[in-house]
């Protein structure tokens, strides 16, 4: 079937040749009908010989030319085709040389763009680290504020700024996340409590508490830094779209896998928005006046969860709230997945 495909392609590309040869032979036959002295037997012999030689020529040309395209079909690199001199005709060699030059030019552009991206990432990272210093100093000044109402309001805004900086830092590290991961058994409860502590200024202002119920062994095999980032983004969303309600945090065992469940009682997510919640920059269509959301939180979560082997399930009801379930992998599943990735890279 594959050979038939190449035959069809070849005949289509050589149809002008074939029509011209057929026209010449038909023309000779037509002339012989006019010239009665021309021997018919000789004419049929010439036409038959001509068509036979043409057929042989087309067959030889087909096998010679299609060989190069078979190499392309096997996804051979153009460098290999060039250096092994797999292009046989001058026209094929000219085509391969052109493609080779174009690939080299595009590779140079990709290298330049990658350097620019690396410089941009480094600049953003340095900026975030540099601005963390005055932000930390700001926190010390806020702690000295004696007016509790003003202090609480300042801490609320400080927490938002600090969270935005952390989010931006993680965004710049997305491309290198695989190199930045170290897996170990860590306490899920400890991670959750640490993240709650970071958001306490926001939750206090909004009148939100946390009901924690850890029913199963809460040690999971994960990267603590990136896992905390996921928990932080989910808690941030729960606080952002809730007010004067508690956030329920619990664990359960699903087929020997530890599952973390974070449930808020906020405004919920509409059905039409649900398929898009992980898109970069997407914000809810329910309230277009909402300006505090960047649409990056769940995008970050979705970008990292597969590297951590975490299954993510989101259910929501408008007016009743949203439930996010994180199902953590077993150690052998992570080791197996990392082995597969390592084998693919070689």
Swiss-Prot record:
Membrane-spanning intervals of the chain: 18-38, 43-63
Residue ranges of every copy of the Histidine kinase domain listed in the record: 126-332
* Catalytic activity reported: ATP + protein L-histidine = ADP + protein N-phospho-L-histidine
Q: Kindly report, in one word, the top-level EC class recorded for this enzyme.
A: transferase
For this entry, list what GO says about its biological process: cellular response to phosphate starvation; response to antibiotic
Q: Which UniProt keywords apply?
A: Antibiotic resistance, ATP-binding, Cell membrane, Kinase, Membrane, Nucleotide-binding, Transferase, Transmembrane, Transmembrane helix, Two-component regulatory system, Virulence
Report any Pfam family annotated for this entry. HATPase_c
On whether Metal-binding is a keyword of this UniProt record, the answer is no
User: What are the record's GO terms for cellular component?
Assistant: plasma membrane
Q: Name one GO molecular function term.
A: phosphorelay sensor kinase activity
- Write out the annotated subcellular location: Cell membrane
Q: What is its EC number?
A: 2.7.13.3
Q: Which InterPro entries does the protein's record reference?
A: 2-comp_sensor_kinase (IPR050351), HATPase_C_sf (IPR036890), His_kinase_dom (IPR005467), HisK_dim/P_sf (IPR036097), Sig_transdc_His_kin-like_C (IPR004358)
Principal location listed in the UniProt entry: membrane
Record's bilayer topology term: Multi-pass membrane protein
Describe, as the record does, how this protein assembles with itself and its partners.
Interacts with GraX.
Per the entry, what this protein does is: Member of the two-component regulatory system GraR/GraS involved in resistance against cationic antimicrobial peptides (CAMPs). Functions as a sensor protein kinase which phosphorylates GraR through the auxiliary protein GraX. In turn, GraR up-regulates many genes such as adhesins, exoproteins, transporters, toxins, and proteins involved in cell wall synthesis. Down-regulates the expression of many genes involved in RNA and amino acid synthesis or glycolysis.
Please identify the protein, giving its name as recorded: Sensor protein kinase GraS
Organism of origin: Staphylococcus aureus (strain MRSA252)
Lineage of origin: Bacteria, Bacillati, Bacillota, Bacilli, Bacillales
């Amino acid at each position: 079937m594959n050979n038939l495909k190449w035959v069809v392609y070849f005949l289509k590309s050589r149809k002008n040749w074939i029509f011209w040869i057929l026209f010449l032979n038909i023309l000779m036959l037509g002339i012989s009908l006019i010239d009665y002295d021309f021997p018919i037997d000789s004419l049929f012999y010439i036409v038959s010989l001509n068509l036979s030689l043409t057929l042989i020529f087309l067959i030889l040309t087909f096998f010679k030319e299609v060989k190069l395209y078979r190499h392309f079909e096997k996804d051979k690199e153009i460098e290999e085709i060039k250096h092994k001199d797999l292009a046989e005709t001058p026209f094929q060699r000219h085509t391969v040389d052109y493609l080779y030059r174009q690939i080299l030019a595009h590779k140079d552009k990709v290298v330049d763009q990658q350097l620019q991206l690396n410089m941009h990432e480094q600049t953003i990272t340095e900026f975030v680290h540099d601005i963390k210093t005055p932000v930390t100093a700001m926190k010390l000044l806020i702690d000295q504020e004696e007016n509790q109402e003003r202090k609480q309001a300042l801490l609320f805004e400080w927490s938002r700024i600090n969270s935005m900086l952390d989010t931006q830092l993680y965004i710049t590290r997305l491309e290198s996340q695989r190199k930045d991961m170290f897996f170990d058994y860590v306490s899920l409860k400890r991670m959750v409590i640490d993240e709650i502590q970071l958001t306490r200024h926001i939750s206090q202002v909004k009148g939100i508490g946390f009901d924690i119920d850890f029913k199963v062994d809460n040690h999971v095999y994960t990267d603590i830094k990136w896992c905390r980032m996921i928990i932080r983004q989910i808690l941030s969303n729960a606080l952002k779209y809730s007010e004067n309600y508690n956030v329920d945090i619990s664990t359960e065992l699903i087929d020997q896998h530890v599952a973390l469940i974070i449930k808020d009682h906020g405004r919920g997510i509409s059905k039409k928005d649900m398929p898009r919640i992980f898109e970069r920059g997407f914000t809810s269509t329910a309230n277009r006046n909402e300006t505090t959301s960047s649409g990056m939180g769940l995008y970050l979560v979705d970008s990292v969860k597969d590297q951590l082997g975490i299954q993510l399930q989101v259910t929501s009801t408008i007016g009743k709230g949203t439930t996010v379930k994180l199902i953590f992998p077993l150690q052998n599943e992570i080791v197996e997945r990392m082995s597969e990735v390592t084998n693919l890279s070689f």
